[in-house]
Every structure is written in C-alpha cells, then in structure tokens.
Amino acid sequence: MRPLTPRQAEILELIKRNIAETGMPPTRAEIATRLGFKSANAAEEHLKALAKKGCIEIMPGTSRGIRLPVEEEDNSETGLPLIGQVAAGEPILAQEHVEQYYQIDPSMFHPTANFLLRVKGDSMKNIGILEGDLLAVHKVQQARNGQVVVARVDDDVTVKRFEKKGNVVYLHAENEDYSPIKVDLSFQSLTIEGLAVGVIRNGDWL
C-alpha cells in the first residue's frame, strides 16, 4: 500500500473510529465538519485518494457509501454483537456495551442486521417479540410511521412501534396492557438506534 499523507491517515482513522462506535461510516459532510474542510467536496477528494491507495472502497449513490477492505477490518471479534446495558450519552455500538458476538450471518436479515438486542418484557408480544428473544437490528437514525424501532428515550432503550405527529412521537406497544410512550421533542430527547429486522427465538440457531 502506498504511504498516506498525514491528512489521509487522519481521515482513515476517523472512518474506522466511526464504524467501530456507530456501526456506520461517516458521511462526506460529517468528515468535512469534523476535520474543518470548507465543503464536502474537499472530503470527497481525499476519499478518492484513499480509494486509489486501496485503503477504502467507495460505493456510489449513497452518502455513507464507504467500506473498509476485508484486510482493513478488525477481525478480532466477528459476527453480530449482542448489546448489553447502554451507558447514558454513549453510542449504542460502543465497544464497552458489547456482551458477546454471535456467529450469525448479518445478510440473512433484510435490511442487513448490525447488532442484536436481548428483549426485556412482553410489551411487543402480539407481533411475536418475546421476553428473552434476540432482536436483530439494522442501524438507522430515522424511522417512518409504523416501523418497529429501537429507540432511546432520555437514555432508556426500548423497542416499540414508531408514530410521529408533528413534534410529538408516540412509541406504541404491541400489547394491550401497555400505554403508548409519548415523547414531546420540544423538551424531551429521543434517538432512533435502529429498525427491528428479525427475531431469534430464545437462542435458537446459536
């Protein structure tokens, strides 16, 4: 591999760190903002140079279309991470939240799963998400009405069906014993951590 300039090395480290912490590469705009570029175009030129040197692969047509070649990926842990207790203010995929890795092909889910979450409680039992199940989650930051999401409300992580009306979000259970969680975005914090894309029943397949 051809040697990197200091700026290229800085961008490559930023990409690796972002993937490790959030499960996703940064956008061009995020790279530009974090490293002080005047525009996303400046970041794009550095990304093209990194691609020519074989450090990254660029997938056209998507703002996060950056991936590390296989030899650049950290293979010390493989498979899907099972996320345990999530610390306040920390990314859900931060390494300290990972309890263990399961050898499950992420592509068996659609969209591809990025992590697993153990289900607590029976609030989603009517759609087959039960206590103790492993929920496969695709990492996203936005959701559409009707989707089942993993959401963080004031640092509590919950699995619910998403509905947004104006500046208010309702997180609906799939169990008549539970009332919706109402989140007024004007003064409450809500983070979408991902979409539910599959369920592994109480450790089946593992």
Swiss-Prot record:
It catalyses: Hydrolysis of Ala-|-Gly bond in repressor LexA. Represses a number of genes involved in the response to DNA damage (SOS response), including recA and lexA. In the presence of single-stranded DNA, RecA interacts with LexA causing an autocatalytic cleavage which disrupts the DNA-binding part of LexA, leading to derepression of the SOS regulon and eventually DNA repair. The keyword Hydrolase applies. The gene is lexA. This is LexA repressor. The active site is at 123 (for autocatalytic cleavage activity), 160 (for autocatalytic cleavage activity). Its EC number is 3.4.21.88. Residues 28-48 bind DNA. It comes from Shewanella oneidensis (strain ATCC 700550 / JCM 31522 / CIP 106686 / LMG 19005 / NCIMB 14063 / MR-1). CDD domains: S24_LexA-like (cd06529). Pfam families: LexA_DNA_bind, Peptidase_S24.
